[in-house]
Amino acid sequence: MSAERLVYVMGPSGAGKDSLLAYARKHVREPRIAFAHRYITRKSDGHENHVELTRDEFAARAQLGFFALEWSSHGFRYGVGVEIDAWLAAGSVVVVSGSRAHLPAALERYPQMCVVHIDAAPHVLAERLATRGRETADEIRARLARSVRWAVPDGVALTAIDNSGTLDDAGRVLVALLEGLARS
């Protein structure tokens, strides 16, 4: 299995990960790039590529070993299916939307993965979170405070993409990275 072809995309809430992943999904031309959806115990809002599971469904799948990666965040469970291992073994570049807090555990399973951190200026994050309408003002402030405290773990090389500007600008950077990995 070629874990260096696993691309773990993460960033603070409001950085635009889902928008960038949707952009990349639409614009990549390399057929060997696969975008894994997540399994989440949260209703889909239409802006994120995920499979909605009940807590019981998630727990059953976790117990059966159906997840390559799984974590909890903000009261929800998240998982990425073991199908990504077959995709990696077949030579695909596999893109997953991950969690910064779960990065150390993900690196234990896939130590050679490519880590991509999407970020945006604090005022852009705040504006996007408010527009999204999922959290109260206090919850938004707490999310922004966590964003400031996060630091790259020692020894992790990552690609940083600033998504403060246009989606097209940041999207082209992500697409170029993915297509470069697929050609290597």
Swiss-Prot record:
Keyword set includes ATP-binding: yes
Reactions catalysed, as given in the entry: alpha-D-ribose 1,5-bisphosphate + ATP = 5-phospho-alpha-D-ribose 1-diphosphate + ADP
Gene that specifies this protein: phnN
Transmembrane segments: none
EC number: 2.7.4.23
Function comment: Catalyzes the phosphorylation of ribose 1,5-bisphosphate to 5-phospho-D-ribosyl alpha-1-diphosphate (PRPP).
InterPro entries according to UniProt: GK/Ca_channel_bsu (IPR008145), P-loop_NTPase (IPR027417), PhnN (IPR012699)
Family affiliation: Belongs to the ribose 1,5-bisphosphokinase family.
Protein name: Ribose 1,5-bisphosphate phosphokinase PhnN
One GO biological process term: organic phosphonate metabolic process
SUPFAM superfamilies per record: P-loop containing nucleoside triphosphate hydrolases
GO-annotated molecular function: ATP binding; ribose 1,5-bisphosphate phosphokinase activity
Pfam families in alphabetical order: AAA_18
Binding site for ATP: 11-18
Enzyme class at the top of the EC tree: transferase
Pathway annotation from the record: Metabolic intermediate biosynthesis; 5-phospho-alpha-D-ribose 1-diphosphate biosynthesis; 5-phospho-alpha-D-ribose 1-diphosphate from D-ribose 5-phosphate (route II): step 3/3
Record key words, sorted: ATP-binding, Nucleotide-binding, Transferase
Gene3D superfamilies for the chain: P-loop containing nucleotide triphosphate hydrolases
